[in-house]
Design a protein with these regions (language model features):
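Repeat-blade elements of multi-bladed beta-propeller folds
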Residues: 33-40, 78-101, 127-151
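Short beta-strand segments and strand-loop junctions that repeat across beta-rich extracellular domains
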Residues: 27-28, 102
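Short alpha-helical segments used as structural interaction elements across diverse proteins
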Residues: 4-7, 44, 131, 136
Length: 151
């Protein structure tokens, strides 16, 4: 192969690779239907939502609809909240408190639907991560979804 044909082949490969990357990025739609089922929004972890109701023009008109207070789950000044809430089927799921309780909250009203707290016993007292809660995931197993969390 001559140096000229080598350069042409390299340039062609670069164009094909860049073209593939660009088309892949454009093809990813992001989180669907206003839901946030995964840590990164969707299965591809794009952290993108295609929702367009909030714009620069109407941003200043936004009002607080509801607020989720978690102080009744054990206020601790050094608590480190690192959870990414999930939104599935009109319900927001999040970890709360120092024992990583999981709550389900109605996305429209802010009403608590349920709370689950696993009794970790002595293990929790010695755990280096006892003051943080993250690790929620959603699994769609063909009809009935599951909320999974790491304890």
């Amino acid at each position: 192969m001559t140096p000229r044909s080598c350069r042409f082949t390299r340039a062609l490969c670069v164009c094909l690779v860049l073209g593939g990357v660009t088309s892949t990025a454009v093809a990813q739609p992001g989180a669907r239907d206003g839901e946030w089922r995964h840590y990164g929004g969707d299965e591809a972890n794009t952290r993108y939502s295609p929702l367009d109701q909030i714009t620069a023009d109407n941003f200043s008109d936004l009002e607080l609809v509801w607020r989720m207070k978690t102080d009744n789950f054990g206020p601790v000044p050094e608590y480190n909240f690192q959870s990414t809430p999930l939104m599935v089927g009109g319900v927001v799921y999040s970890t709360v408190g120092t024992r990583r309780s999981v709550v389900a909250v109605d996305a429209g009203t802010g009403e608590y639907l349920w709370m689950h707290r696993l009794d970790e016993g002595e293990r929790a007292d010695e755990a280096p991560r006892r003051l943080s809660g993250r690790g929620l995931a959603y699994r769609d197993n063909g009809g009935s979804g599951q909320i999974i969390y790491v304890t």
